């Protein structure tokens, strides 16, 4: 009878919670629908999250086909459409792979993925509220707070739990971060369940909830699993110590031992072995749950070790800037658009009042310490650094603070020291106040908040940063009408080779995910570190080591990467200047796809006379030097010799010989000795011993240039004898730009200051601006800034980004221009790159000047500032040599549904030993 009564109470609670949740979330959706906005954030959600979810469903269906057709349980895990090609699991796990809710996309047709994506945005917070309710009901309903320094609770019904759950699910993580990055809400589901699992193990010795939750959390997202593991470890440590000590104290009191105090102290200390036993027990259960997810987690951890973001060392200040602390106070009651360090709270006013009340109540020692600890962590960058795995400072762990404050509200409301006059009336008014404050958070936040730097004008509030509402057909059109579709269509019409890659100007983020066409564009959080190392070694001007667009239009690198096509979205003379050497004009192509055409904003209905399809057109160029997926070398270059070369020499070297690491060289030398001494012609060592070390031929030339400085900038060149010469004015002396170049330094006291390098133009060549060991920083304050007072060292603050804009000139006429956004250590996207070779493009009649615009004040120093011209025809004859012996009969073994693969086969007919 009692069990049925509890079940009925829980059913009524779930029903009440569901109704209230639907009302409040309906208010949220209403703001978007009134502005004809979807719940898909136009930046990361459109570029990454939605594309990842759509491909995940396609990939799962492809693996089911692979199982039924090929009778293989081994998934086809390689996708050519993820940038240069990448592993599906390790690349997309961060977004969806492993999460049980996302796995249901296997049943969702691709055109309906957007609807399911929006459904998950609303479902995850609902589940988080249920998990919070389960934990709170166990802790408060069953009075599990004994022995912890907390006061007893009264039987105040489910009102406190319901209010805490609603405050939890309508906090900043859901209302803001969860709208931009929906999977950020997933750990909010698991955190209460992990804590509940710990309590179940400690009190009832039932590990089932804990084991299953650890397993699901490890499967769902390795990044948040790390955070959850730290939080659960701290929680378990505190709860085990408190509970074990409390139980020991009760036993000691029950023994009534009035004997010697020494015996009493020994009994009090006997809780330590028991606490260790319980902690080890929890650790064992956690290990079992984690190992159960090993098939997903282990590949992720291996990939994470080579992830370029993880390998980069960022700066760690002792305190945040003062703007952060002032923003934090506002953040407590409403959400901030694009907050500093992703610190988002948006707590209900009632929660804050409950926290204040907590410190006026007797007991609740653990909760008070937890609140103080959370406040300290919010104020110290070190907390964000540790919770982010030591990569950089970011506060995406604040969902735990929201959980804490919501639970404090539940505990305070349930405490016997809190009494409501008129009981039901008082509690009803308090409950109404909770609902009103949550509704106000939604209304004030979504209406008041202006659109951020990635959004629109902001006139319509937060929803203006989201994509327009779309039908299934319109979604397919918007997702597929891009340069990837145009290239794929053109390649099919012209019978392109089995493998090809494209690049271009203004590429769509992750467009190849849908078409599974390889490109030079990649924007996923977990990246292959080898690609970033390649960019660093060649000095490629790219924004981030995990998000990159192309190869800086370099002819040699385009050929080496197998880039077959170059696309231009805006077909004009300016854009055409960036097309690399060797690309033949193939005309324009319309990016049709299988979906219905997008309706015009006029509201014309498909089929009406006024309806016209919106079909983007792309200009396509085809590379005559594109190398296939398999090409060969007859010689090699030592890595040590390669590293000693100039940046532009390295790309020419890669056309002539394969670069071998030291262990590869040792293996080859061992093979040569083995063949000479024993005549053994078998084995791997003997087969590669025919490769010879090559001496690369270089056609690039360094130009001697003169430096002309404008207002607000001074140029200091340090000669070989150590003497520094400050050069300032319209015409500075010529700089010796030979092999032994001098160090350079620019002091910029005025944003927008310009420096012009003049040199002899080259014909039929690419022109590069080379900067080695680039470093930037604030002015030291010794000189006065233009029109301003002196600035002391303590006032000077390092910026996150120092943009450097470069324009190529010919007879004073601007040709091409590019920007280097140099990021400092305090920027979360800092890559550690300091060497750059900026390609200003190929021209038959090259540039004779480079104009450098420093868009921020500061000091810009570099060990080398060089102008290099690279004759293209002479360089690319080495690419022709690579076409002599290539892989033929190439089969990518692509899945017909997902286009994923697990093997590549082909034939190489070589007359001598070659390196493939």
Where are these regions (language model features)?
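Soluble catalytic regions of membrane-associated enzymes that act on cell-envelope
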Residues: 107, 442-916
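Membrane-embedded helix bundles of polyisoprenyl
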Residues: 21, 121-139, 149-241, 281-301, ...
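Membrane-interface coil-to-helix junctions
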Residues: 24-129, 166, 170-188, 306, ...
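Membrane-helix boundary/interfacial segments in multi-pass membrane proteins
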Residues: 115, 174-185, 311-342, 371-421, ...
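Perimembrane helix-loop-helix junctions
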Residues: 228-288
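Membrane-interface helix-loop-helix junctions at transmembrane boundaries of multi-pass membrane enzymes
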Residues: 267-280, 355-377
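Periplasmic/ER-lumenal interhelical loops and adjacent helix-loop junctions
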Residues: 47-48, 54-59, 63-66, 94, ...
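Start-transfer (signal-anchor) and selected internal transmembrane alpha helices
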Residues: 1-32, 277, 281
């Amino acid at each position: 009878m009692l069990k049925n009564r509890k079940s009925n109470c829980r059913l009524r609670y779930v029903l009440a919670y569901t109704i209230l949740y639907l009302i409040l979330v309906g208010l949220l959706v209403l703001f978007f629908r009134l502005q004809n906005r979807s719940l898909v954030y136009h930046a990361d959600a459109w570029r990454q999250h939605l594309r990842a979810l759509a491909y995940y469903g396609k990939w799962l269906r492809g693996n089911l086909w692979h199982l039924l057709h090929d009778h293989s349980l081994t998934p086809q895990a390689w996708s050519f459409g993820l940038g240069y090609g990448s592993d599906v699991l390790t690349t997309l796990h961060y977004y969806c792979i492993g999460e049980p809710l996302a796995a249901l996309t296997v049943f969702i047709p691709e055109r309906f993925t957007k609807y399911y994506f929006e459904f998950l945005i609303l479902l995850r917070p609902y589940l988080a509220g249920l998990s919070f309710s389960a934990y709170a009901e166990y802790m408060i309903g069953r009075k599990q707070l004994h022995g912890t320094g907390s006061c007893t609770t009264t039987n105040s019904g489910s009102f406190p739990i319901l209010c805490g759950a609603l405050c939890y699910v309508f906090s900043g993580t859901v209302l803001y971060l969860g709208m931009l990055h929906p999977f950020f809400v997933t750990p909010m589901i698991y955190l209460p369940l992990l804590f509940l699992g710990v309590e179940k193990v400690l009190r009832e010795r039932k590990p089932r909830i804990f084991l299953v939750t650890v397993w699901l959390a490890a499967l769902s997202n390795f990044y948040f699993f790390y955070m959850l593991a730290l939080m659960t470890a701290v929680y378990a440590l505190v709860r085990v110590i408190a509970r074990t000590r409390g139980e020991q104290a009760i036993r000691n009191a029950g023994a009534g031992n009035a004997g010697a105090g020494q015996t009493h102290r020994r009994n009090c200390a006997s809780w330590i072995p028991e606490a260790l036993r319980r902690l080890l027990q929890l650790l064992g259960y956690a290990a079992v749950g984690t190992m159960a997810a090993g098939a997903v987690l282990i590949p992720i951890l291996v990939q994470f070790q080579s992830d370029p973001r993880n390998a980069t060392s960022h700066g760690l200040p002792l305190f945040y800037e003062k703007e952060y602390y002032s923003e934090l106070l506002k953040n407590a009651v409403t959400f901030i658009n694009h907050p500093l360090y992703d610190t988002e709270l948006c707590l209900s006013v009632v929660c804050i009042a409950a926290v204040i009340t907590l410190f006026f109540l007797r007991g609740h020692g653990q909760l008070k310490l937890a609140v103080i600890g959370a406040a300290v962590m919010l104020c110290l960058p070190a907390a964000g650094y540790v919770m982010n795995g030591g990569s950089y400072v970011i506060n995406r762990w604040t969902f735990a603070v929201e959980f804490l404050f919501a639970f404090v509200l539940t505990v305070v409301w349930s405490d016997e020291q809190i009494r409501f006059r008129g009981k039901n009336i008082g509690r009803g008014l308090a409950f109404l106040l909770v609902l009103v404050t949550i509704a106000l958070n939604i209304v004030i936040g979504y209406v008041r908040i202006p659109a951020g730097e990635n959004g629109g004008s902001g006139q319509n509030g937060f929803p203006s940063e989201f994509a327009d509402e779309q039908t299934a057909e319109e979604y397919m059109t918007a997702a597929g009408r891009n340069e990837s579709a145009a290239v794929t269509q053109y390649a099919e019409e012209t019978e392109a080779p089995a493998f090809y890659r494209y690049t271009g100007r203004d590429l769509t983020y992750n467009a190849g995910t849908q078409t599974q066409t390889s490109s030079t564009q990649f924007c996923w959080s977990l990246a292959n570190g080898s690609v970033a190392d390649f960019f660093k070694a060649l000095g490629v001007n790219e924004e981030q080591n995990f998000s990159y667009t192309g190869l800086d239009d370099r002819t040699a690198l385009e050929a080496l990467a197998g880039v077959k096509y170059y696309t231009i979205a805006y077909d004009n003379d300016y854009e055409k200047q960036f097309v690399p050497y060797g690309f033949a004009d193939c005309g324009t192509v319309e990016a049709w796809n299988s979906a219905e055409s997008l309706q015009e904003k006029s509201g014309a209905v498909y089929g009406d006379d006024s309806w016209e399809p919106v079909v983007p057109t792309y200009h396509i160029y085809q590379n005559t030097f594109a190398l296939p997926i398999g090409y060969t070398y007859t010689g090699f270059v030592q890595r040590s010799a390669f590293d000693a070369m100039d940046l532009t020499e390295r790309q020419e070297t890669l056309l002539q010989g394969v670069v071998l690491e030291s262990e590869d060289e040792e293996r080859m030398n061992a093979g040569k000795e083995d063949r000479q001494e024993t005549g053994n012609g078998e084995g791997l060592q003997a087969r590669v011993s025919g490769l010879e070390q090559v001496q690369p031929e270089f056609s690039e030339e360094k130009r001697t240039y003169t430096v002309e400085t404008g207002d607000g900038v001074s140029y200091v060149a340090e000669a070989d004898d150590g003497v520094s010469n400050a050069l300032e004015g319209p015409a500075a002396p010529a700089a010796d730009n030979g092999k032994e170049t001098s160090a350079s330094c620019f002091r910029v006291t005025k944003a927008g200051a310009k420096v012009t390098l003049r040199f002899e133009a080259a014909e039929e060549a690419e022109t590069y601006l080379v900067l080695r060991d680039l470093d930037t920083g604030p002015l030291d304050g010794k000189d006065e800034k233009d029109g301003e007072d002196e600035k002391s060292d303590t006032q000077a603050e390092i910026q996150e980004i120092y943009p450097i804009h470069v324009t190529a000139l010919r007879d004073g006429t601007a040709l091409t221009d590019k920007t280097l956004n140099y990021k400092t250590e305090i920027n979360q996207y800092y890559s550690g790159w300091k060497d750059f070779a900026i390609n200003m493009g190929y021209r038959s009649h090259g540039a004779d000047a480079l104009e450098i615009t420093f868009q921020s004040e500061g000091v810009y120093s570099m060990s080398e500032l060089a102008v290099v011209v690279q004759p293209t025809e002479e360089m690319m004859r080495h690419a022709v040599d690579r076409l002599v012996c290539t892989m033929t009969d190439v089969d990518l073994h692509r899945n017909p549904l997902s286009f994923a693969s697990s093997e590549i086969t082909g034939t190489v007919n070589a007359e001598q030993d070659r390196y493939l």
